């Protein structure tokens, strides 16, 4: 059995420390091709991308981030719109998530690292990057070469899995921000 995809999935980690080495335009195009290969409802492809690799534009972007200022040499702002979608729910956000995951997985294949940022000032980011009304910046992917390597890891936990019905007698301990900060302090993130 070929386990390449599974191994890539486990190797994908949120890296928060990058070298200064630039990502080539060829690799950026490969990342965007992977992104656009993501599934989307009715193949409506609600995404668009702003590639940011100029230092002054990166500085402006990081000023919009509430957290997650990791100063990678490349950022991709993934934007989306549902203006062309006949139903008006938030399902298109799943399409954007699949798109982002494809980029993060392809980063692993290219020897790059990434972290997905969802906490930012949406209005300010839209203004700075001339994002038109009706288009939303959904997430920012910071991408670069990792400053250090992390081992692949499975976060599988049996208590997150329910069979046939949701078993309310089982209690799952959810991870907290304190857990994240402890992991960072211990060099695990």
Feature annotation, model-predicted:
Residues 1-189:
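Acidic, surface-exposed loops and disordered segments
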């Amino acid at each position: 059995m070929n386990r390449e995809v599974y191994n890539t999935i486990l190797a994908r980690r949120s890296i928060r420390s990058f070298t200064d080495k630039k990502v080539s335009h060829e690799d950026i195009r490969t990342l965007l091709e992977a992104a656009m290969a993501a599934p989307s409802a009715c193949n409506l492809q609600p995404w668009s991308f702003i590639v940011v690799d100029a230092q002054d534009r990166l500085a402006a972007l990081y000023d919009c981030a509430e957290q997650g200022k990791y100063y990678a040499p490349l950022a991709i702002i993934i934007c989306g719109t549902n203006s062309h979608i006949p139903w008006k729910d938030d399902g298109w956000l799943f399409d954007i998530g699949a798109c982002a995951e494809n980029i993060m997985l392809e980063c692993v294949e290219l020897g790059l690292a990434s972290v997905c940022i969802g906490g930012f000032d949406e209005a300010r980011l839209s203004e700075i990057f001339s994002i038109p009304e009706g288009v939303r910046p959904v997430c920012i992917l910071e991408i670069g070469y990792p400053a250090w390597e992390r081992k692949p890891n499975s976060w599988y936990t049996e208590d997150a899995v329910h069979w046939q019905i949701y078993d309310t007698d089982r209690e799952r301990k959810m991870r907290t921000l304190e857990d994240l900060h402890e992991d960072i302090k211990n060099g695990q993130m």
